[in-house]
Amino acid sequence: DLQTTIKQAKNKILDLAIHGKLVPQVPNDEPASELLKRINPKAEITCDNGQYGKIPEGWCETILGELFEHNTGKALNSSNQEGIMRDYLTTSNVYWDTFDLSVVKQMLFKENELEKCTVVKGDLLVCEGGDVGRSAIWNQDYDICIQNHLHRLRPKAELSVRFYYHVLKYLKDNNMIGGKGIGLLGLSSKEL
């Protein structure tokens, strides 16, 4: 079937990109460890191909926390009667590479919660439960808040958020999160 063939082709292209085989590797390019230092000077670089033979020459292994600021949103609390009424997203609004904004809920957010819970254009949102890892990039020209079952990933420097969206999609499609692979039923902050 055509849809299966398209999905397999997308997965193969992403697999090649993740492993540095989609385009030729240029030996004169800046090593990934130097790029990581520019993105996050405090990053701990655990290797630069020392023990990981599976990654391309010049690449390094890191964690999302070195590249993105990470937060989850606010838990719904009916006893909370203070703050500013704001629209917020739940996991039911987030689908693969899109948002369903037909039903957007509201709750009160205190001033000191807004920075942690607000999503801005370019943020990657990732579902913690349900369809674990389901993700989309917020591309609206207005800010919105999130509830606690959504992870907000905001890049610390200029990088391709879309690439990381595709990495999550690849991991999900290949049962490496939320499925048979590592069998996560939820995606906690630590696991992400």
Model-derived regions: residue spans:
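Generic recognition of stable, solvent-exposed alpha-helical segments in well-folded globular domains
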Residues: 4-12, 34, 54, 59-63, ...
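Amphipathic alpha-helical coiled-coil/heptad-repeat segments
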Residues: 1-39
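A short beta-sheet element
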Residues: 90-91, 109-172, 181-183, 188
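Short coil/turn segments at secondary-structure boundaries
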Residues: 24-30, 47-50, 77-85, 103, ...
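Sequence-specific dsDNA recognition surfaces
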Residues: 47-50, 65-78, 92-121, 141, ...
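Short helix/loop capping segments that flank catalytic or ligand/cofactor-binding pockets
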Residues: 25-26, 97-99, 135-136, 161-162
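Proline-centric
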Residues: 1-3, 16-17, 24, 53-62, ...
